[in-house]
Amino acid sequence: MPRPLIAAIAKAILLLDAILILLALAGAAYQALGRSRDARRFPQHGRSIQAGRIKLNLDCTGDRSRGAAMVVLDSGSGVPALGWILVLSEVAKFARVCSYDRAGYGWSDPGPEPRTSIKIARELKALLEAAGERGPYVMVAHSFGGFNVRVFTSLYPADVAGVVLVEGSHEDEDQRMMQLLPASVIEREAKADQRNERIHRIMGPLRVWLGIQRLQIETGWGTPDYGMQSSRLPKRLREEFLYLRQQANFGRAVAAEGRAFPQSVAEIRKAGGLGDRPLIVLTAGKPLDPDPILTNEQMDKLENLWIYDLRLQEAHLSTRGKQIIVPDSTHMIPIDRPDAVVSARVPQWRRNRWTSAIR
């Protein structure tokens, strides 16, 4: 190859490298300026409290009447404490209630791995004690948070007066649902899980740092829908949720919980039932979105498994368990039907009496 051509190629490569570096620096500056602006727009909900080796964000409101339990809210995977915003304000009208950001979420520090339910439950216990928020508690959990509060109950049984599982995860759901799916769907879902794990663990923080995700959101191109972009939420809250999703620690935390999920499943199997504690299981009854690969019969079987089998099993975790189907809600009941959560949960606990507003 002629030397002039080699020199030209080398110059082109150097120029390309310089352009990429400048773009990366520009993206990082764009992200830093945007983050500074957002931090002023969206002040912290709650306060940071030292819980062992890390600081966690705890948001408590409402008064605690004598003899009443305090309500503690735990979110699903990928949802910060902000996901309870429509529930929190209503419960606070008649009870003391606290939501919190798990390690790496929202305004909380990242936590040590593996991010199993036992570790999460112990961190929550340390947080509540450090904040002076004493039991007994009514533990309310959405999705993956259900694992955490069930483990919490097994570790600290004297602290838990009652439980509300809002579309709580079931230890057998993946295995049982896979039995109903064709091989093509199983392969598709496995690839999607692997891709999402890589995005959260590696590409997610990089996209945040370079300002790529912010650019997508602010230009309206590819704005992600994480269940918190519902029209039920005011525009400012939707923007605040996207701001919290743009923190690099957030993607790492979601990925870490996902990697530790098999361990959490093993922990929940050992945790056992909930005894005779009052238990309400809220179940989304809205039909699943159609899947082009699945037949109507297969979709019906999946819905029946989810609503009438797995969730009913959860209700049987306690001798005083009750399932309530919310017919017009998706999995995101705290957003779609916060009133159902408020009514179910606030079953108020006073001197060993559980009164539910839902009959």
For each predicted feature, which ranges?
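Catalytic active-site module of serine/aspartate enzymes centered on a nucleophile-bearing elbow/loop
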Residues: 309, 317-359
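Conserved hydrolase catalytic core segment
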Residues: 134-180
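The conserved beta1-alpha1 loop
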Residues: 72-76, 142, 167, 284
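Flexible "cap/lid" subdomain of the alpha/beta-hydrolase fold that forms the substrate-access gate
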Residues: 117, 160, 164-310, 321, ...
